[in-house]
Amino acid sequence: ELKSEARIKGQDLSDYYGMWVHQIKTPIFALRLLLREEPEENRESGAQLFRIEQYVEMVLGYLRTEDMSADLKLTRCSLDRIIREQIHKYAGIFVSKKLSLSYEGTDAIVLTDEKWLGFVIGQILSNALKYTRTGGIEIWLEDERGNRVSENPNLKQNTAPGICNTAPATLVIADSGIGIQPEDLPRIFEKGYTGVNGREDNRATGIGLYLSRKILRKLGHEITVDSQVDKGTEVRMSLWKKDLEMY
């Protein structure tokens, strides 16, 4: 009985925050329209509003991951389209920070949930941009041998309807940022853990990577991170799982 009451209270709280997130989107959208009238004069205000939008999206993502089963839609998606949508979303930050972007594109098709994978790629890009002061970000695809690929027909091979039987491949997002301390690496996927970098940056929430791994595992994907202090960070997402049945 106590567990049931706690579950109901937890659901009520989740519903409340979900309603709050959806309601706050309306004034944010109105502000965005106002700022577009004089974009040059409102550039800094627009940047701050973008940060607010990202925090709101993170909260909404966190709430939805509590029960993703009803919100999952696995389809064969263009990985290139998903990546480019997120690049476009963060284009303003690339420009304002004068960071370079290297991405050649890919013809790969992935069996995934387009919205959720886009959310994860956005989180990784956001982190990379946040902790990169000079240089830039590079995005590429690797095959099962670790070789870079741009257009690989094997990645589009499918078997019977409802089955994805593609070659293993990994999406890599690398930056030239400040890197992650070695002692922090084993804990970066823990909920709320921010590490040394997070303690020096008040904007850190310790939620982005936690959500990213949780979502990717729900999709049958995996994520790993390699990093060197003052050299940068590489995030690898294995996006193909052989004989993954659609449901």
Protein language model features and the residues they cover:
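Short helix-loop "hinge" at the ATP-lid/N-box region of the Bergerat-fold HATPase_c
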Residues: 128-129
